[in-house]
Amino acid sequence: MAYIPRLKEEYKSRVISALTEEFGYKNVMQVPKLEKIVISKGVGAAVSDKKLIDYAVEELTKITGQKAVATISKKDVASFKLRKGMPIGAKVTLRGERMYEFLDRLVTSSLPRVRDFSGIKATGFDGRGNYNLGVLEQIIFPEIDIDKVNKISGMDITFVTSATTDKEAKSLLTELGLPFKKN
């Protein structure tokens, strides 16, 4: 029997029925699902030091278990001393089993390591059922060795869902274990 991530199994067995009951879907295909997770990291100082991009790509690769790619600038910005085509960040897109594994690790081991953690804000929804979460320090992930970090930096995590409204997306992410703050 093939390995199935814990959260994927939980989604199929419990979350689909809970969301169907809550929103009254007529068909299982109407139930929103998590489509992808995009983790991105901007490295503004990379304009002067090219090695910072390599560190960012390496850190994202360690955190996600999938090779990250460097992002490049699309146009010149003279005030930032930036030229078109220069690397300015890194990103990785997770789908399928790796996506569920990352979400599981984020909820169970990484978010509880944040100082004074009382839940994540529910203000990161974009109106179309996607959620954006900012992480201030990469050292909350157990895969990162604190002694080998040359600079503490944050990252953006985007949860792309098939939900059409923010309410549906919040219910989906809450059922999958994201700890939102109580109002």
Curated annotation (Swiss-Prot):
- List GO molecular-function terms, semicolon-separated: rRNA binding; structural constituent of ribosome; tRNA binding
Please give the GO cellular component terms listed in this UniProt entry.
ribonucleoprotein complex; ribosome
The UniProt entry, under Pfam families, shows: Ribosomal_L5 (PF00281), Ribosomal_L5_C (PF00673)
The keyword Cytoplasm belongs to this UniProt entry's keyword annotation: no
Q: Which UniProt keywords apply?
A: Ribonucleoprotein, Ribosomal protein, RNA-binding, rRNA-binding, tRNA-binding
SUPFAM superfamilies in alphabetical order: RL5-like (SSF55282)
List, alphabetically, the InterPro entries matched.
Ribosomal_uL5, Ribosomal_uL5_bac-type, Ribosomal_uL5_C, Ribosomal_uL5_dom_sf, Ribosomal_uL5_N
Q: Which GO terms describe its biological process?
A: translation
- Subunit structure, briefly? Part of the 50S ribosomal subunit; part of the 5S rRNA/L5/L18/L25 subcomplex. Contacts the 5S rRNA and the P site tRNA. Forms a bridge to the 30S subunit in the 70S ribosome.
The entry sums up its family as follows:
Belongs to the universal ribosomal protein uL5 family.
Q: What does this protein do?
A: This is one of the proteins that bind and probably mediate the attachment of the 5S RNA into the large ribosomal subunit, where it forms part of the central protuberance. In the 70S ribosome it contacts protein S13 of the 30S subunit (bridge B1b), connecting the 2 subunits; this bridge is implicated in subunit movement. Contacts the P site tRNA; the 5S rRNA and some of its associated proteins might help stabilize positioning of ribosome-bound tRNAs.
Can you name this protein? Large ribosomal subunit protein uL5
The gene is rplE
